[in-house]
Amino acid sequence: MRTRAVELVLAGVLLFGLTVAGSALVAPDRSTAAVDDGSERATLVGSQGGGPGWHEHGSAYLLNGTDIEWREDSADSYFDVQRLSDGRVLAGFMDGGYEECGPYESPCAHTGIRLIDPDADGGAAVVEEYSFPVRSQSNSEIHDAEPLPGGGFAMTDMDHERIMIVEDGEVTWTWNASQLYDEPEDPTRTDWLHINDIDRVGEDRFLVSVRNANQLVIVERTDDGGSEVVEIINEDTEGSPDDSCTGNGQLRDTDGDE
């Protein structure tokens, strides 16, 4: 009986694990945030969309139960969304059809951040935008952005694999992942590190997701305007094999060890 009980427990644990894994595999590509304006709770959603490459018919919208209170769908894709203290919504986005393309052929895609006013005349509308051209819509987006106490926004950039601070439409600080990881010849041509999340965890300190390295890093903006990695979570130890991470081709070993 004892053996049978152990078998049942193990089977239950296995079933739970498979259920969680299955849920992760089929989860829709949406970012959600709870909104509480003092009267009732609602859910703010950023939808990347569908179609080839998951960059068609994206939108940002507010759900109250099953009712959509407002929707802004002028971009091919929206990503992380959050409501700001003034009621506007900060959203990472990507959209095609831009004429200002820098080194790339026109028309091209842009990625960046938008500020959406849900209460604009005529319905929710984009009232501010910061964006720049990217080579393609594949793994090149501003996936996450955070407002800063003194103004400006910190954000991730998957195209150049960096984090940066933008103030008044200008990049005022940057940390490039190539300062820590071995860079390919052209990061804009491959899904190298897939840096897709940033959180402010202290004054001038940011927690950054480096998905393809299976690591988190804490980056500090130094007083001289530079940057320093102060902690690596899940850091490789010297001499540790990377076979378990790279065997299925899902993660990359880019830390320069053997």
Predicted regions located by residue number:
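Hydrophobic alpha-helical segments
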Residues: 1-258
